[in-house]
């Protein structure tokens, strides 16, 4: 099983006994050496600490919300020097201020800037000898004005009656996997669908097919669990049903949980249900 685990968030919450966390369960799940531990870059330069917890082995991932934004994008970090522990870098563009508008609209190749930022990110990372994790958010598909483009038009619009995950599939955002190499990771943020196991599976299957058709040897992961801002009240049983439904399609999961006792206990029970 491959896991993609945020060090300061998911891991710290799941090992916090006061919140109902269980270090033994977390160790059983994430201590097998196949976990990719991540930390979001905030411009700390070479002083950024490795996300791999003491006593664990795994892949150390430095996560970015931008390719370049002048402060804490991948190119900004490279210009200041990457920490020596970095083994992989993650590109996590979302509909938030951390990702520049130009990048939100050019995840795939866009004729206006004449680039794909997913491609630029992968090329730079591979040039540096680093593995890559691509994890574009579903909310890149939206109808918000984008000031970086002519007429402020959204570049991945959602059609009337369509959901953003349907637009994600229609716009083929997962086709960015063409720029990944064997051993890299593509993660689908499927957690928005987790309370409906059938839908979770069908949409994840559509995304996995896009990844498989255009790449070779790429590790495909699915998101599971949500934090306060978007919490859906999912039970451990619902998370387990969703995860088991896509087990033939995925190599593992990106579990999301914040420091909330209800959500922590739910995620621990989910891990126990999976045998940890």
Question: How would you label these PLM feature ranges?
Answer:
Residues 1-276:
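Glycan-processing catalytic domains of CAZymes
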